[in-house]
Regions:
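Catalytic phosphate/nucleotide-handling subdomain of diverse soluble enzymes
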Residues: 8-14, 27-33, 75, 80-151
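Flexible, glycine/charged-enriched surface loops at secondary-structure junctions
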Residues: 20, 41-44, 107-108, 124
Length: 151
């Protein structure tokens, strides 16, 4: 986990060099690490709340009515993590994140990264998405997948 948090800090400093931006990146990276290493949603939630101080007690139904486009980590990362925590599978995670409104592409990107680590991506969805890639992008994706499989 220490290496995950260190790398999250280093990568966040390039584009989000603010304490809250770094904290958000580390919280997401920690959730991904925990999901990828077989931890439960309860454990992921507890770790993020304890380590980063995010309040993950509100449900998506409670967030949705008042949520709007916000460009701060403290009002994006917890909501994205909550969408993952409430989900039942990868697609449900993305749909839940988008349903919150606001900066929905960012929410879905964050939620999706955690959901991929926890659930994996359904093969039919992978195939459908791959149909839309150029050969060059397909080659890059394959290289990234191969690199991850070696870890």
């Amino acid at each position: 986990m220490a290496e995950t948090l260190r790398l999250a800090r280093l990568t966040a400093q390039v584009t989000h060099d603010h304490p809250e931006g770094i904290k958000g990146a580390q919280a997401v990276a920690a959730a991904i690490f925990l999901a990828r290493t077989g931890h439960s949603k309860v454990e992921i939630k507890a770790y993020v709340e304890c380590k980063f101080g995010y309040d993950l007690s509100r449900t998506c139904d409670e967030i949705r009515p008042t949520y709007h486009h916000v460009e701060s980590c403290q009002e994006t990362v917890p909501q994205a993590i909550t969408a993952f925590l409430e989900s039942t599978d990868f697609e449900d995670a993305l749909r839940t994140a988008v349903s919150l409104g606001g900066d929905s592409d960012t929410l879905a990107a964050i939620t999706g990264s955690i959901a991929e680590a926890f659930y994996g991506v359904p093969e039919n969805l992978k195939q459908e998405c791959r149909k839309r890639l150029t050969p060059e992008l397909e080659e890059i994706l394959q290289a990234c997948e191969n690199m991850l499989l070696q870890r």
